[in-house]
Amino acid sequence: MALALNVFKTVTQIAPTSPVGIFTASTGYTGVVLLAQAANVGSSTKKVSLSHVRTTAGIAVTTEIVKDLPIESSDTANLLAGKLVLETNDVLKLSADTATDIKFIGSILETLN
């Protein structure tokens, strides 16, 4: 069976207090993050972090995209200014300073290598 050339995915997650992988680029595909937004549904300002992790030769390198970005109550923040390319096995990680109030949504295009 032939592999799909392009696959669109939506990722949703309530941000935990410790970084968690919310998307890993599949083998044979490149992921293109088209949208990454976080909404604060709580009653006070909360902070969110989003990072890219690439492991090469067994060494994981974390690059922060946003770190401790404050989002006011009942507001939303775009976490990317443009697109982000994720190579095979790259991981997108998310965390916040609360485990209940930051809701993430992302749109990702996986394209066959």
Region roles according to the model:
Residues 56-91:
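Intrinsically disordered, low-complexity Pro/Gly/Ser/Thr-rich segments with frequent PxxP/GP/PP motifs
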Residues 5-7, 52, 71, 81, ...:
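Generic detector of low-complexity/intrinsically disordered segments
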Residues 38-43, 97:
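Short solvent-exposed strand-capping/beta-turn motif centered on an Asx-Ser/Thr pair
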Residues 1-31, 35, 56, 95-113:
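C-terminal interaction-tip segments
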Residues 48-50:
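Short beta-strand elements bearing conserved aromatic residues within extracellular beta-rich modules
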Residues 41-44, 55-57:
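Acidic glycine-/aspartate-rich tracts in secreted/extracellular proteins
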